[in-house]
Amino acid sequence: MASGIQPDAGQILNSLINSVLVVDDALAIHYANPAAQQLLAQSSRKLFGTPLPELLSYFSLNIDLMRESLAAGQGFTDNEVTLVIDSRSHILSLTAQRLPDDFILLEMAPMDNQRRLSQEQLQHAQQIAARDLVRGLAHEIKNPLGGLRGAAQLLSKALPDPALTEYTKVIIEQADRLRNLVDRLLGPQHPGMHITESIHKVAERVVALVSMELPDNVRLIRDYDPSLPELPHDPEQIEQVLLNIVRNALQALGPEGGEITLRTRTAFQLTLHGERYRLAARIDVEDNGPGIPPHLQDTLFYPMVSGREGGTGLGLSIARNLIDQHAGKIEFTSWPGHTEFSVYLPIRK
């Protein structure tokens, strides 16, 4: 190496874009580089001595597993750690190494945006494939169902004993029930009539409908951005989307009750389905219920997937389909005590 002035370790750590922490076995912070201070929104002086989990609303890291790996003399890596600070969710790749004097070095790197985008695209493709499969099956069910209903009607007219028509009545009623289920599985087949108006009109209709269903221990909060521009949309379809999500939130709260927040904001420079938009509307539905079980999160928008006993699992699948027809997207974050669905609708390129 050429001779000259060499940067010390502090200069190197200060210049890193990755967050670096030195913690003890209790995860109390003894050092935080500038990137970590920015991530945790605290100065190094305030961070010193504070256990890392106390700064976070949610931390998905398996701390016991990390300690076991370090105790065995091995490093530890988790390529997808979620942490939440002041309602801001971050997905990071975390690496841990044992240091002398029982300290632990934690390095946290933001998850690559391209990787996140690829995962979203893969999940979206899988959801479309599942939806197409269900639609194909629904069409196959619908044809013989019509024949079954028609035959039951003819049989009802031919039966001499009125008491026997009770059985054909049951067949017809159950055939109609199945047909309604199939129609819901198929969902809307064509884009609706789009008009340009404030999305808050739709939000207020949803509030009016849900308010009649609210128990006394549930509070519905409206947090609207008055500067949000008007945007082209089908009011009935967006109403159905928001109604499905808000009702899911209400059911998730259960008998314990809680809060549901309906929030609107303007999003800037957003990519939707490969198109870049200067402006988009973001509509959030947030609740403080128990959260979505981790085993359901990857398949939540698939047809027939539900975390509720007796649920059809169609509400979010239909909502995703309707938002796709608006060239928008739905995403969510969830951990115990917090679930938030965000609907993005394009305003202008």
Swiss-Prot record:
This is Sensory histidine kinase/phosphatase NtrB. It is found in: Cytoplasm. Disulfide bonds: none annotated. The modification Phosphohistidine is found at residue 139. One of its GO terms (biological process) is nitrogen fixation. Its EC number is 2.7.13.3, 3.1.3.-. Residues 136-349 form the Histidine kinase domain. InterPro entries: HATPase_C_sf, His_kinase_dom, HisK_dim/P_dom, HisK_dim/P_sf, PAS, PAS-like_dom_sf, PAS_fold, Sig_transdc_His_kin-like_C. Residues 5-78 form the PAS domain. Transmembrane segments: none annotated. The gene is glnL.
